[in-house]
């Protein structure tokens, strides 16, 4: 009887691309260079996702998904010319200017959002820069929503320092003011304000003690280096934002960017992953454009470190996955919403 001959045992290991060092400057607290961010974006896709997921698990072990609802409380008629925005008065998009909603209308919408599972309620108004009387009216809305037990967020345009303080006194938890893109590409998107105007507003918000919500848009015709520049700008804010919404451009007929080339879905996932790596303690939010991504790409975004979504059938004036679709997606992925809380978060380290 002869014994069977077996092949010698061999061990196979996955070979990952050498890790990109977070740059000596970053380790010394000097911030992220555009080159260092670009090197992350250029990593092989699976290596990048592995690193982003490792970072995410280290800082967000509970693995929950924050559900935020965004309501346009004052729609249209904005004098700005942001090339992506259907609410600009300069573009013929079919969006009609409307007055500020009443306290009753807003609280009804906020209660419905809470009943559907949202924990944060965001209010957007299409102003370039609100007047003091607008801030007084918004303060009433903020207090009313806060009384429902929801976290509050507002995006109202450029703020002065005393206006930010008034919003803080009203109970505002977060203020959204996106950088949109890198400073080098900003003038290609909007010419009615300067990049520094956005940075100044963010400083007023931070000085008032309000948490910062700040991100950008992918797919506006920007080059890869501009995506790296945007992430570097966000990560180098001191401290970096508590919430970082990443939008995939929704191409709206009548806007200058309506014919922009759609962003490659995997490139969008890359931006999510690098946002997670460079801002590990931030809530990285899947924002506008989720509907065009599909379930599989959204799942990759969650794997890459996204842990917040805008939840509800509409985002300002553009469509969003309906609540039932999101509920089913999260259930399929085994993801759960964040427990409700109204306390503000501590600032993220730079």
Curated annotation (Swiss-Prot):
Domain of life the protein comes from: Bacteria
Reaction it catalyzes: (4R,5S)-dethiobiotin + (sulfur carrier)-SH + 2 reduced [2Fe-2S]-[ferredoxin] + 2 S-adenosyl-L-methionine = (sulfur carrier)-H + biotin + 2 5'-deoxyadenosine + 2 L-methionine + 2 oxidized [2Fe-2S]-[ferredoxin]
Free-text comment on the cofactor: Binds 1 [4Fe-4S] cluster. The cluster is coordinated with 3 cysteines and an exchangeable S-adenosyl-L-methionine. Binds 1 [2Fe-2S] cluster. The cluster is coordinated with 3 cysteines and 1 arginine.
Record-linked Pfam families: BATS, Radical_SAM
InterPro entries to which the protein is assigned, alphabetical: Aldolase_TIM, BATS_dom, Biotin_synth/BioAB, Biotin_synthase, Elp3/MiaA/NifB-like_rSAM, rSAM
Domain Radical SAM core: 63-281
Pathway, per record: Cofactor biosynthesis; biotin biosynthesis; biotin from 7,8-diaminononanoate: step 2/2
Family, as annotated: Belongs to the radical SAM superfamily. Biotin synthase family.
Quaternary structure, from the entry: Homodimer.
Listed name of the protein: Biotin synthase
Lineage: Bacteria, Pseudomonadati, Pseudomonadota, Betaproteobacteria, Burkholderiales
The gene coding this protein: bioB
């Amino acid at each position: 009887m002869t014994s069977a001959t077996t092949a010698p045992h061999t061990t196979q290991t996955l070979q990952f691309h050498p890790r990109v060092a977070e740059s000596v400057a970053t380790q010394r607290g000097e911030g992220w260079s555009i080159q260092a961010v670009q090197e992350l974006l250029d990593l092989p896709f699976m290596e990048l996702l592995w690193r982003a997921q490792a970072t995410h698990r280290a800082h967000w072990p509970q693995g929950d998904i924050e559900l935020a609802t965004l309501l346009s409380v004052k729609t249209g008629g904005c004098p700005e010319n942001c090339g992506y925005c259907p609410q600009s008065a300069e573009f013929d998009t079919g969006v009609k200017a409307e007055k500020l909603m009443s306290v009753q209308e807003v609280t009804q919408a906020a209660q419905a959002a809470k009943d559907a599972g949202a924990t944060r309620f965001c209010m957007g108004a299409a102003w370039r820069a609100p007047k003091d009387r607008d801030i007084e009216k918004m303060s009433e809305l903020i207090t009313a929503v806060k009384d429902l037990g929801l976290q509050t967020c507002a995006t109202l345009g450029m703020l002065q320092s005393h206006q930010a303080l008034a919003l803080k006194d009203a109970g505002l938890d977060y203020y959204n003011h996106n950088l949109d893109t890198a400073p080098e590409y900003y003038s290609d998107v909007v010419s009615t304000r300067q990049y520094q105007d956005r940075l100044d507003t963010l400083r007023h918000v931070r000085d008032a003690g309000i948490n910062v919500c700040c991100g950008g848009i992918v797919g506006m015709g920007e080059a890869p280096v501009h995506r790296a520049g945007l992430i570097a700008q966000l990560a180098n804010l001191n401290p970096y934002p508590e919430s970082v919404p990443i939008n995939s451009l929704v191409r709206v007929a009548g806007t200058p960017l309506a014919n922009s080339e759609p962003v490659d879905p995997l490139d969008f996932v890359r931006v999510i992953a690098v946002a997670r790596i460079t801002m590990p303690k931030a809530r990285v939010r899947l924002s506008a454009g989720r509907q065009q991504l599909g379930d599989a790409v959204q799942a990759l975004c969650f794997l890459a470190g996204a842990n917040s979504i805008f939840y509800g059938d509409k985002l300002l004036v553009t469509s969003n996955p309906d609540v039932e679709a999101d509920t089913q997606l999260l259930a399929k992925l085994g993801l759960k919403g964040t427990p409700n809380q109204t306390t503000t978060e501590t600032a993220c380290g730079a």
